[in-house]
Amino acid sequence: MNSGSHARSCGRVQDFAAVREDFDAIVGAVVYSTMTTVDAKGRPRSRVLIPVWETGGEEPLGWLGTYRTPVKTAHLKGNPHASFSYWSPAQNTVSVDVVAEWIDDPRVREHVWDLYRHGSPPGAGYDPGGFWEGPGDPRFQVLRLEPWRIQVLRGRDLVSGVPSRIWRRDHG
């Protein structure tokens, strides 16, 4: 079996566009995601959060408006990789593996604030004013989430034996 046929049998896709519609639909419907990081001893820690995603370009980009808690900060300092998982009772799932980085640029904070207010993708997001005074509030911190792997599986495909679709960022 050549590598191209292996990729197809595993559901691997070359372009994010091949999973964008289902990614947006599932994330927009589920909204809440489990974010998992690991500590210095490799032990996982999960928390439920709402990231937002920009999916209109060739490659997706995520953002998380959050508090810079000591645990999250220590975990990401030791290992910037994190995973976000979405699941619905219809067995629709999205898993996003990212490299996370704290961003302190005021323009980026305003941009992320607006993404939350307007929903990105539609359905995801919320009014961050319920937690913070505005994008300049020092408690409002932003994580840039650069996906390197995204796996999408619709429940109807699961029961039909269709493999999940996996997109990976090409780092050359």
Language-model regions, residue ranges each:
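Short, basic/aromatic recognition patches
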Residues: R8-Y32
